[in-house]
């Protein structure tokens, strides 16, 4: 039997040969320092970024977002596209439902002049286009809306009443087998939006399931269940929805965490609203009755007024966000070893009339 030293020498020789034949890094030790940290695409909600455990949607992976109608699935993906573009990336939107609203996308911060859009005729065409874009190596984020609308060519060309059992599931399974490796190699994130269906004859457990078979459940590194839980009102007028997202699968961090945030009509995810919620939760922002207070100064009466104040003063919003991230350990504290500075002065200058509340 070879000695441990001989086995280690043989392993080093084999690894060197693999690197020469297949490229450096084809095989590596799991704890190697050469492994790069996970890159992410922010979702637009700090609450969801924290729930995901890594600060956003992972690069080079498949993500599934599913939920009932009008729950915020497309809104969430458009925010991710806008964030990817702000970071200098290129995004593509494969609109199998033929329902993308350019005006709404622009309001959410998407650069529609730079966004690549395809409205394919069949499921095969949609997935082939996605595969070609991924293999180009130039795309950072691809969204497919939605899995349920990826209709196989045989179904489109057939008669209305024809049975096509398992066609879509086989199509998805084959496509995902091809896409997974290419996504990892090109560091491209692919988001599949999916719809809910109900199983017939289920008496125990949830009857809900998603379209497109089981392959996507296995290949997705992150699965997000998004639900509308409350209608936000300004007086009697509905102005948005309170949304809850549950991370039902997460290969990058512990799963089953939840996030809640506001989606405002015509605005999208309220980033400032999430800052207020998280600030109150982590005692960085104080709430007394209807008033929100930060470092002894009143931001506003009611969440809407406080949110508007943060929109008008992005430097204060950024300060609160940075403190939240430091407290949660998402970013390092640059002043950990430094003397505390009098940062409150800038805030007092912006709030002279509210001082002393």
Curated annotation (Swiss-Prot):
PROSITE patterns: RECA_1, RECA_2, RECA_3. ATP binds at residues 67-74. This is Protein RecA. GO terms for molecular function: ATP binding; ATP hydrolysis activity; ATP-dependent DNA damage sensor activity; damaged DNA binding; single-stranded DNA binding. SMART domains: AAA. Its main location: cytoplasm. Pfam families: RecA (PF00154), RecA_C (PF21096). Can catalyze the hydrolysis of ATP in the presence of single-stranded DNA, the ATP-dependent uptake of single-stranded DNA by duplex DNA, and the ATP-dependent hybridization of homologous single-stranded DNAs. It interacts with LexA causing its activation and leading to its autocatalytic cleavage. It comes from Leifsonia xyli subsp. xyli (strain CTCB07). The gene is recA. Keywords: ATP-binding, Cytoplasm, DNA damage, DNA recombination, DNA repair, DNA-binding, Nucleotide-binding, SOS response. InterPro entries: AAA+_ATPase, DNA_recomb/repair_RecA, DNA_recomb/repair_RecA_CS, P-loop_NTPase, RecA-like_C, RecA-like_N, RecA_ATP-bd, RecA_C_sf. CDD domains: RecA. GO terms for cellular component: cytosol. Belongs to the RecA family. It is found in: Cytoplasm. GO terms for biological process: DNA recombination; DNA repair; SOS response.
């Amino acid at each position: 039997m070879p000695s441990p030293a001989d086995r280690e020498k043989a392993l080093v020789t084999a690894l060197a040969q693999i690197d020469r034949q297949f490229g450096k890094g084809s095989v590596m030790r799991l704890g190697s320092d050469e492994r790069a940290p996970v890159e992410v695409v922010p979702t637009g909600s700090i609450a969801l970024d924290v729930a995901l455990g890594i600060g956003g949607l992972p690069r080079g992976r498949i993500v599934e977002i599913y939920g009932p109608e009008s729950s915020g699935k497309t809104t969430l993906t458009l925010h991710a596209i806008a964030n990817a573009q702000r970071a200098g990336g290129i995004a593509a939107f494969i609109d199998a439902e033929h329902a993308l609203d350019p005006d709404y996308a622009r309001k959410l911060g998407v650069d529609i002049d730079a966004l690549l859009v395809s409205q394919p005729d069949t499921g095969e065409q949609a997935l082939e286009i996605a595969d070609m874009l991924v293999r180009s190596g130039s795309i950072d984020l691809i969204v497919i809306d939605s899995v349920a609308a990826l209709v196989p060519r045989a179904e489109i060309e057939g008669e209305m009443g024809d049975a096509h059992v398992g066609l879509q599931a086989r199509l998805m399974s084959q496509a995902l087998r091809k896409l997974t490796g290419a996504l990892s190699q090109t560091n491209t994130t692919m988001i599949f939006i999916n719809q809910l269906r109900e199983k017939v004859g289920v008496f125990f457990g949830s009857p809900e399931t998603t379209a497109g078979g089981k392959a996507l459940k296995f290949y997705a590194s992150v699965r997000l269940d998004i639900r509308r839980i409350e209608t936000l009102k300004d007086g009697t007028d509905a102005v948005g929805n309170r949304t809850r997202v549950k991370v039902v699968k997460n290969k990058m961090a512990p799963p089953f965490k939840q996030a809640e945030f506001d989606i405002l009509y015509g605005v999208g995810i309220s980033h400032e609203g999430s800052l207020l919620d998280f600030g109150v939760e982590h005692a960085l922002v104080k709430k007394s009755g209807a008033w929100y207070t930060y470092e002894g100064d009143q931001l506003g009466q009611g969440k809407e007024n406080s949110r508007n104040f943060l929109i008008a003063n992005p430097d204060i919003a950024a300060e609160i966000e940075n403190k939240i991230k430091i407290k949660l350990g998402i970013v390092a504290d640059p002043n950990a070893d430094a003397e505390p500075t009098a940062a409150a002065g800038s805030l007092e200058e912006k709030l002279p009339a509210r001082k002393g509340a």
